[in-house]
Amino acid sequence: MLVVNVWGSWCAPCRVEAAALEQAATDLTDEGVQFVGIVIRDSLTSAQQFQEEQGVTYPSIFDPDSSTLLQVPSSLYPVATPTTYVVDHEGRVAVRILDKTTAPTLTGLVEDVLAEREAA
């Protein structure tokens, strides 16, 4: 399972949610959940500084011109920053959050998706 967060260092809600995402990533490690960020409309220096200051340890893809995001189907294209996706084991987007999130909310949603897989 994969959690993808679209963010930018210039984004105030991204700054608010950074610690929550890091906490969720830590809490879900034993479940085999991977986290990755996609940095948009940002400089590499600002993005790296943001990750260091916010204590973000999961990797991020540097996408200043949004070319990576252009690969996302238009129905799922992020219309807000931050946007967080939970991608299930079959590669389907199971959850899309169009605002900042909290660790309990994100962890709960991921656990729900994991439970659906186990029930199947």
Describe the predicted segments one by one.
Residues 117-120:
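Non-globular targeting/processing and membrane-anchoring segments
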Residues 15-54, 65-71:
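Structural microenvironment flanking redox-active thiols in thiol-disulfide oxidoreductases
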Residues 52-56, 64-115:
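Thiol/disulfide oxidoreductase modules built on the thioredoxin-like
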Residues 1-15, 21:
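Short active-site neighborhood of thiol/selenol oxidoreductases, capturing the structured segment around
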